[in-house]
Each structure stands twice: as structure tokens, then as C-alpha cells.
Amino acid sequence: MNRIRKFFRGSGRVLAFIFVASVIWLLFDMAALRLSFSEINTRVIKEDIVRRERIGFRVQPDQGKIFYSSIKEMKPPLRGHGKGAWGKENVRKTEESVLKVEVDLDQTQRERKMQNALGRGKVVPLWHPAHLQTLPVTPNKQKTDGRGTKPEASSHQGTPKQTTAQGAPKTSFIAAKGTQVVKISVHMGRVSLKQEPRKSHSPSSDTSKLAAERDLNVTISLSTDRPKQRSQAVANERAHPASTAVPKSGEAMALNKTKTQSKEVNANKHKANTSLPFPKFTVNSNRLRKQSINETPLGSLSKDDGARGAHGKKLNFSESHLVIITKEEEQKADPKEVSNSKTKTIFPKVLGKSQSKHISRNRSEMSSSSLAPHRVPLSQTNHALTGGLEPAKINITAKAPSTEYNQSHIKALLPEDSGTHQVLRIDVTLSPRDPKAPGQFGRPVVVPHGKEKEAERRWKEGNFNVYLSDLIPVDRAIEDTRPAGCAEQLVHNNLPTTSVIMCFVDEVWSTLLRSVHSVINRSPPHLIKEILLVDDFSTKDYLKDNLDKYMSQFPKVRILRLKERHGLIRARLAGAQNATGDVLTFLDSHVECNVGWLEPLLERVYLSRKKVACPVIEVINDKDMSYMTVDNFQRGIFVWPMNFGWRTIPPDVIAKNRIKETDTIRCPVMAGGLFSIDKSYFFELGTYDPGLDVWGGENMELSFKVWMCGGEIEIIPCSRVGHIFRNDNPYSFPKDRMKTVERNLVRVAEVWLDEYKELFYGHGDHLIDQGLDVGNLTQQRELRKKLKCKSFKWYLENVFPDLRAPIVRASGVLINVALGKCISIENTTVILEDCDGSKELQQFNYTWLRLIKCGEWCIAPIPDKGAVRLHPCDNRNKGLKWLHKSTSVFHPELVNHIVFENNQQLLCLEGNFSQKILKVAACDPVKPYQKWKFEKYYEA
């Protein structure tokens, strides 16, 4: 111990302290150096990982684990391999760390993608350059919203293009013989699913041959909005990045219809991924198994809902005297299946709770590509359609033909609750469209050389180019003319069903068929209760047995035949009385419904049963049959004497109220030919006035009735229907056409215009002079009282305030220009005296019926005596009518005179101040005592 102590005496203590400090310093230095090395290694690893992520480099420690997406991206090892400042050991450790990170990344991606591959091992890219023909836009018009491209613009892109949902390109599909091509897109909130099955075929198959042999062309878009699950869906999007296995919009998938592959589909039934919050769908399995597509030239609808009454009972058409039952109708009551191996049917199997969930990772994928996919086996195609999540299994088999359309295929995708989905974009045909056919895509058609005389001769058949109409396919495609944003609008899942009512008489065959096909092809089948064709006693032979036979292929189409000519109004009433749908949708028989036309109409009626929804009526040119769009900001109006017309909303009003193209427009008067109305509300209003004859004025009557009795009329810009506008009506009238229309208008005026009916008569004075027999109005006036309808003045102030509707043409004191004196009443005579605007006996009105009246008394001439007297007012008494400010056409020099019109010689009102009396004398344009003016004048 003493020996040790001596080392710490004197200088020894210093040496010991230095030694200990050196050891401690060395330890800290070594630790710092180790930390520095570790930090450098970590930084290098991170930089290498980032660099390799950018260049697509993947280290492949095991060639058996090579993933397809990295084969073409193989790179040499890192530069400086085997070298470095830390020696071989540090380099080896660094490389092992990098390899471990890369292996983990590859393993994670492989697991994620193999999970989506339904256990089939090999993963095949889902997009591939395709040879699909895109729909063209109207000539000389380039669409910029992505809904259409020029015919020459074929899709040969190498990568799918991201677009918005509304910009999904319209694509025609090609399939091998015996293959049904189905394109179904499902949107749920912010996520989407595209299903487009195609039959597999060899790479050497001829595309043109496939186009000629395809059987079915179906385009269906479906989207549902699930607000409660939106946040969970977003979280899952972040947790599961989009995989290349998700198909893009516009892609078509091929499904082989073999027994082995059908078993493969069923074998994977239990593999549905339930990690994402999907809505649950339920459907009647027995009903679904029975439904199929009837192989007909162009399409069919379900018979189940075709002709049932409100209590689910089949409607016996023979019970109505308005209906003639054909043999085809009786046969449809008990359809029999006929064996036909060529007939294909498509129907979904039962949707299990976990299998009925449709979703994809991003809404933009819904319409991101117009490419056809590579040929894929059934199992991988099924994976592609679901993105690894199995929805309802699609079973494709060969069955006997049926007359039922698979409406539940769409309906099953909609939740049964009161949620919402995006408007369905449906365009269904059972035979392929020829893109080179005349008039295809709404293009104009030119009469072939040498056929001009025939076309001119046939013009009279329909007062439009019937020759060209017969050349155009009855199911031609037309451009989607809806404003941008309509495709994303939400509608409720539980919309009411509708009965579409078309009345016709001697309609052109091709035009009538095109109208029916446009409804069938572009309407959600679960919303169409029936299509009622009301034949108003047509005389054309082709509209009898031939029409019955043709329409027998569509179970939801019913033909009601009137036994005598009743006219459009009563024909529509017959259709309404036989309709079984919740909503009545009236259409003309020369229309073409555009995509997405029906749901926006039914949505407005669903929101309020007192709303009457009208589509935007676009133009089908009567000369070249081209489909032309119209201004989005138009509304129906009328001018006196109740002449219907269209008026564009002024730009300053649009800017001030920030009206968008997709906003509904309040419509004072509807055109009357195309609209949807709740059936029960229609009958509550008393339907059309049954006293109206044939055609004309019914749109005015129903418009006034709806607005004044608590309803609303709206134009829905997202619903578009083309209509052939003709310069003349080709249909015959039992009586004189003009008198029939005028009689109807007089009947409407007498019931609904109140005191403003004088304004109506003032613009058509001959109407009151003719003394038209308008029939008994008691029932209609009692109906107005029962409904507690508002006045026509309320209508003008609240619905149509921009209509000029002064009750009188002029009012106030009536001044003699030369004398400066005013007409006044003294006792029972008419005199001149000093003007006094506050004196009631000097206040005169010049009415629209050309009476000069003060209260109930009117100024009347006594031509024989040249005097003037007072007479009780009578609108029909021609001896009380004067012309003032309205003689400019015939006698412009007498424009400031007051002229008695009912006399062979023109007599004018003249003042005589000396005697304070009035008289009538021969008109003299330069005589100042015959010039008069009212205090105020009004225009209408």
C-alpha cells in the first residue's frame, strides 16, 4: 500500500491524472468515431435507396423471385463496389443492409400484388395498346371535355391517360363471335370500379372479323355515394396505394365461357377482401337466376315489370275499350324457352354479403383510359375487374332465349337504402353499331345522287326528310351533349319507376322505332316500368300487325290502340289511365333520348312530387337528320295571344345570379311534348282539360295549372332529348286546324287568365268576334276553386315577371291636343273641361278590346247624329270599339286620332270647346281638334 501511495506523491500525482484522462479521452474518441461511421452508413443507405427508387433499380438476390415489372429495369451493382474508406468489412455490411432493404421492398410489393392475383401466380399487365374506335363528335366541332374525339383519332397509346369522370371517352367494343361485351363502371363516393368483360381470343385474331361478329354492346356507368364510409375509404387508399392491377376506364375484359373457368370463378368465392368499407347489396336470387337477355336485333326490357298493376296483378288490356289485344300480347303472357345454343345470357349470381362490394382506389381511374386490355384468362380477368376484391360473380352461360332484360344486374349494384349514386351512363345495343352508317353519331346525311326526287316525294309522309330517316340506323349513336359536370351529379338510389307514354298517328316507321330504341337503350331498365305506345287510330298498314310483331320482342312495350281518332290530348289521357309507373313521362314519337336523360328527371320528381321536370329539347334537323345541341340557358315562354316560344336568359342575369350550365331553370311554360310528372299529382290536378280538342293549348293549360296550384316546372340541363322540329304538322284534324287550336286557347283563357283575358283577346280580337263554342267551363272553374289556385296576377308577378301584361293599352286623363282640355263625365253625358288628374270621372282606360271606358260605362258614337253618348260596356259590341295608335299600318296620318272603326266612312272623335261637347265627324288628318292623347300608354 505504501508503495502505491508513493506513486501519487508529488509529480507522480500529475502523471497518474494525465494517464487516466488520456484513457477516458481515447474511449470518447473511439465512441465518437463509431457513431460517425454509423451515421455515414445510414446516410449512404438512404441515398442509395432514394436513388434506386428513382431509377427503378432492384437488386435481385434470387432470380426465382424476379417480379415482372423490374425485369426491364435491371441495373449493374453500385459504383465503388468493393472499395471505400471503411474497408471491405464496412462495404460488405453496407451492401448487406441495402440488400435487406431492397428485399423487404420487393417482398412487400410482391405480397400486395400476389394477393390481388387470386392465387394464380403469374401477374399480367391489365392495359395494352388497343384497336378500339372512339365515337366522333359533331362535324366542325371539337369537344374539349373528353367526351368525344374525331373519328380518325384511334387509341394507340402506350400508357393509360388520367381524365376526369365526365371525360370518359365513348368507345365501341369488339369481341369474338359468340361473345357478349359488357362495359360496366361503378363509382362509389371517391372510388370506382370498371367492369368490361371480353372473350379471350388468340393474338392472331383478325380485329375486323371480330367487329363483324360481335353480339352485344353494353355501356353502363354506375356510381354510389356513401358519405358515412368516405373517411374510411380515404384511409384505405393511403394504406393501399393504387396497383397496376386495377383496370382503367374504357378498358374491356374478355371472359371465356367454359365450364372450367366458371368453376374457377366459383372456387374463388370465399376470397373476397372485406377490409374496405363497402355498401352491402342484396338481391332476390330466384329472380336473378331467371333473368336473361333476349337475343333480338337491338335490345329488350324486363317483362316482370312490363304490364303489372299497382297491386302486382297483371293488367288485363282487354278490360279497356281503348286497347286492342294482339296475338303477340297473348303469347307474351306465358313465354316459353326454346333451345338455342347460339343465344347467350348474362346475369349475376347471388350477391353475398362480402361479395357484393365494388370499389377501386381512385375516382380518376374510373375514366382514365380508352385502351383495350391484353387478352387475359378468366381468373385473372375476374381479378382485374375487382382489383383483388371479388364483387358479384358474373356467370355467362348459353341458355334458351328469353324475353326478359337483366335489369337487376344494375339494380343489384345499388344499395337498398336512400343513398345516392352518380348518374348512370347507359347505352345498350344487342347488335353492334356500324360507325360508318349514315347519320351515325348524329352526323348530317346527304341524299345520294339520283335520289333527290324520291326524297322530295317522300317528304310529305312526315314533313321531314323521311328518305334519310329510313337510311339511318334505328339505334344510332348520338353525341353526349350534356354540360360538363352532369356525369358527376348524384341521384338517389331509390328513384321512382316511370311509364313512358308515346302517342302517335301515322308516324314514320323508322322515326317511331328510333324513338323507342333510344328510350330502351339509354334508360336504366329498373326505372322503366313500361313503354306505352298509344296509337291514335293510325291508317298506315305498317303501324298495325308489323308494329305489333316488332314490338313483341320488348316485353315492356305495350301498344294501346284507340278505336277512333281522339287527338293528342285525349290519347295521352288514355295512356295515363293505363300507366302503372309512379311517374308519367310523356314523349313525342319523333325523338331521340340522349345518355343519362331519365334519372335527372326522376330525381327532381323524387325531391318534390309537385315538380314537373322537362328535358332540354335539342334539335334533330328535319332536312339532314343531324343531331344539334342548343343553348343551355333557354326557357319556355309565351307571347300574346299565348303563342309558345323559347327565350334565352340574358347574360347579365346569368352573371348576376351565377347560374351554371348544370343548374335547373324555372320554366314559366313548358313546350308540352316532353316532361315527367308524378302520376298521382297529375290526376290531382285534373290531368289535361278533357274539353280541349285534338292538339294545341294543352301545354299552356297544364303550365298555368301547375304553377298557380302549388307546383313548379323546371328544365333540367343534364337531361337532353332530341326532337324533330317541322315547319308544318302533317296530321289531319277532324275539324279546321286553326279553329281547333284557337278554340282550345280561348277555353284556357276563360278559365285561367282572369281579367288578363282581355289582353289575350286584344291580340286576337277575331277570337271574341267569332263567338267560338268552347263548351261548358263549369267543371274546370270548380276544379280551380277546389285546388285553391292562385290568381293569374300572382303568376305574372312571381313566375313570369318579365312578361309585359298591362291590363289596358292606355289610361289616365284623355286630352284634346288642340284645346288642352280633358274628357269628363257629367251626369250621363260626355263633356270637355279643365283637366284634373285627381277627378275620378276624368279617368279613362283604353282597353285591349278597344273600348274607351270609365268604370262600367263606355263612350259610344251615334253616327247618324254625329253625337257621342255613354253606353254600358260590352266586349262583344262592335259599336263601342275605337282605333287609337293602331291605325299606322292602314292610315298612318290618323295615328293620333280616335277613329270609329265600324263604319264605312272613317269617323273621328272631335272636340268643341265653345260648347263643351264631343262629336264624331269625318276624319281630317290636319284638323287639330281631332287629335288626342292619353296620360299613359302601355305595351305588351
Curated annotation (Swiss-Prot):
Residue positions where Phosphoserine is found in the record: 292
Domain Ricin B-type lectin: 804-935
Assigned keywords, A-Z: Disulfide bond, Glycoprotein, Glycosyltransferase, Golgi apparatus, Lectin, Manganese, Membrane, Metal-binding, Phosphoprotein, Signal-anchor, Transferase, Transmembrane, Transmembrane helix
The record's note on its domains: There are two conserved domains in the glycosyltransferase region: the N-terminal domain (domain A, also called GT1 motif), which is probably involved in manganese coordination and substrate binding and the C-terminal domain (domain B, also called Gal/GalNAc-T motif), which is probably involved in catalytic reaction and UDP-Gal binding.
Name of the protein described by the UniProt record: Polypeptide N-acetylgalactosaminyltransferase 5
Keyword Plastid: no
Polar residues compositional bias, start-end: 152-166, 218-234
GO cellular component, one term: Golgi membrane
Keyword Acetylation found: no
Pfam families: Glycos_transf_2, Ricin_B_lectin
Disulfide bonds listed in the record: 486-718, 709-789, 822-835, 858-873, 908-923
Region (Disordered): 131-174, 190-252, 351-373
Source taxonomy: Eukaryota, Metazoa, Chordata, Craniata, Vertebrata
Superkingdom, taxonomy of origin: Eukaryota
Glycosylated residues (UniProt): 217, 256, 273, 316, 362, 395, 406, 578, 776, 827, 845, 912
CDD domains given in the database record: beta-trefoil_Ricin_GALNT5 (cd23436), pp-GalNAc-T (cd02510)
Matches recorded under InterPro entries: GalNAc-T (IPR045885), Glyco_trans_2-like (IPR001173), Nucleotide-diphossugar_trans (IPR029044), Ricin_B-like_lectins (IPR035992), Ricin_B_lectin (IPR000772)
Cofactor(s) the protein requires to work: Mn(2+)
